[in-house]
């Protein structure tokens, strides 16, 4: 079972992404462990406290204190999380800034079911 994290300071955005993932689960007959975080700090704190290794993280970039990019940089420094697939879900027009942390993809908010399905297909294929 894959561990998926969703990190966005807006609850509605987190719930929408989780809904897309649940629809994928139903369609494909797979199950994921899904975790939600309201900030980069909350995500990093949870990674330090618990022994969770995420296979996929959806990160919003525009969050209050730590941005998604700053959060991703810290995650990439961790040996256990260095292979985690990161997808930025953002309203930012300039996606070049994200390339320094080698994201799997950058998705414009709010994202679509088709786009999330393709990302999940990709991650599952990598893990097979």
Placement of each model-derived feature along the sequence:
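His-Asp phosphorelay/catalytic-motif detector in bacterial-type signaling
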Residues: 52-55, 79-85
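Short amphipathic alpha-helix used as the core "switch/output" element in two-component signaling
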Residues: 45, 69-82
């Amino acid at each position: 079972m894959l561990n998926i994290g969703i990190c966005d300071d807006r609850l509605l955005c987190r719930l929408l992404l989780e809904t897309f993932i649940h629809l994928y689960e139903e369609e494909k007959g797979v199950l994921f462990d899904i975790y939600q975080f309201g900030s980069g700090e909350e995500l990093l704190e949870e990674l330090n406290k618990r022994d969770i290794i995420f296979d996929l993280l959806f990160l919003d970039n525009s969050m209050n204190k730590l941005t998604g990019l700053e959060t991703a940089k810290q995650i990439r420094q961790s040996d256990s999380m260095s292979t985690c697939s990161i997808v930025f879900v953002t309203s930012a027009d300039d996606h070049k800034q994200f390339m320094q942390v080698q994201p799997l993809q950058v998705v414009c908010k709010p994202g679509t079911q088709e786009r999330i399905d393709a990302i999940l297909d990709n991650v599952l294929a990598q893990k097979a």
